């Protein structure tokens, strides 16, 4: 088995960079590895139109490290008031690549999200017309539904109907966490894809809850039982082009995670490809990593794959205990632990 792994430079098809003083840190971490990233729009206030997307994009570009060619791919935040005209203007801007459906209350800064999918059918029709993907946080949010069941219930109540109602619409089922979602995407038409995070490949809910609550493993959708983890590993390493890399790297300041009511999100951007390599190596599937990380996503979005490469070496190193996050700190996933793969820094 080789101790070096060279891949076409990957892209991240789902990331949270936040805004303001933290951008030089979050953008620096993603730009270290990835050429492009789909930028989540759940700011306060959210990114609701092409003008707001353009302004956020400029802030990201201004935060890039010197010499970086990192390209942010912007996303609109759908609300009950998003119009077909908003979608067409976003497409015409040339900088917006998708629109995001957050069920209201599903995750961080989703209170402005969609209260009923029926409310945005005209906007979804416009997405299908202009060829812009719909990105879906696939969880129901009703209080009586168990948090571990919310993804499956979303499939049964909404996702099947959505795919049937809009047969030409490209749909990304984001950060899938269940065997149910993996099966749904596998059996769906070719216009339905999914992203999978590193944490959902490497961990299950036991890692978060057994022996004490570990807040830095807490994300939404929440980690599930190990049988679902196995199904996600099967999907990611299958070579099926429907599945591609999306870190959902989502930083929160340490005090917001280590709290009586802590925020959801794992920060993985600083070492994401190294973690994915670890997961794929566990399955003896390192030969499938380039497809998952570098080829399937661009193909789904109708974009060219990158032509430059990165190289990983099998070399243990210790993840930092914390990282700068504006004037505060963020505790990354795997803080203080050994990682088995290291990115050669001359790739940056």
Swiss-Prot record:
Biological role stated in the UniProt entry: Catalyzes the reversible cyclization of carbamoyl aspartate to dihydroorotate.
Quaternary structure and partners: Homodimer.
Top EC class for this record: hydrolase
Residues where Zn(2+) 1 binds: 14, 16, 100, 248
Cofactor remark from the record: Binds 2 Zn(2+) ions per subunit.
GO CC annotations on file: cytosol
Pathway where this protein functions: Pyrimidine metabolism; UMP biosynthesis via de novo pathway; (S)-dihydroorotate from bicarbonate: step 3/3
Catalytic activity, EC: 3.5.2.3
Cofactors demanded by this protein: Zn(2+)
Record-listed Zn(2+) 2 binding positions: 100, 137, 175
Residues where N6-carboxylysine is found: 100
Name used for this protein in its record: Dihydroorotase
One function term, GO molecular function aspect: dihydroorotase activity
Stored InterPro entries: Amidohydro-rel, DHOdimr, Dihydroorotase_CS, Metal_Hydrolase
The organism's place on the tree of life at top rank: Bacteria
Keywords: Hydrolase, Metal-binding, Pyrimidine biosynthesis, Zinc
Catalytic activity, as annotated: (S)-dihydroorotate + H2O = N-carbamoyl-L-aspartate + H(+)
SUPFAM superfamilies in the cross-refs: Metallo-dependent hydrolases (SSF51556)
Pfam families: Amidohydro_1
Residues that bind substrate: 16-18, 42, 137, 220, 252, 264
Alphabetized CDD domains for the sequence: DHOase
